[in-house]
Amino acid sequence: MNPNRSVAVDKVVVHMGVGEAGDKLVNAERIISEITGNTPVRSVAKQTLPAFGIRKGAPISCRVTLRGEAAEKFLETSIKIVENKINSRAFDKQGNFSFGIEEHTDYPGQSYDPKVGIFGLDVTVVLKRNGVRIARRHIQQKKLPLKQLVTVEDAKLFLKDRYNVEVQ
């Protein structure tokens, strides 16, 4: 197989939305940094939602972006937690996919603490092929050929071959 046609993991984004600032967000940041080993970044609300008590610009969630070997290792652990099954509706047109994990206590080394509670998290995986750099570089930037884009079928085949995942 042509090495430029092979699919690889570009990045894994781990997101915890808590809906409010304060102790709950601080606890979520601590948990996400323990699980991933990286420092989280806070995300702010894009609009005001009075029904939920959220103001525009208020920090309401945190996320971590993993790349390289750390992303692959975290993805393996996360896929085992969801029992090697991903819904077919989890894929977008570019071959990226997302899935949720209901309890952070499913990860190794995490235990339930009544003071903290239980947090769920979202895992988003972005896939790429070699040669994507020509579309992202600043000097002599080119359009990416359509055959170089990752399709949904390519992503499903990659998951089946690499991580033994069943797409439902």
From Swiss-Prot:
One of its GO terms (molecular function) is rRNA binding. One of its GO terms (cellular component) is ribonucleoprotein complex. Keywords: Ribonucleoprotein, Ribosomal protein, RNA-binding, rRNA-binding, tRNA-binding. GO terms for biological process: translation. This is one of the proteins that bind and probably mediate the attachment of the 5S RNA into the large ribosomal subunit, where it forms part of the central protuberance. In the 70S ribosome it contacts protein S13 of the 30S subunit (bridge B1b), connecting the 2 subunits; this bridge is implicated in subunit movement. May contact the P site tRNA; the 5S rRNA and some of its associated proteins might help stabilize positioning of ribosome-bound tRNAs. Part of the 50S ribosomal subunit; contacts the 5S rRNA and probably tRNA. Forms a bridge to the 30S subunit in the 70S ribosome. NCBIfam families: PRK04219.1 (NF003258). Belongs to the universal ribosomal protein uL5 family. This is Large ribosomal subunit protein uL5. It comes from Methanospirillum hungatei JF-1 (strain ATCC 27890 / DSM 864 / NBRC 100397 / JF-1). The lineage of its organism: Archaea, Methanobacteriati, Methanobacteriota, Stenosarchaea group, Methanomicrobia.
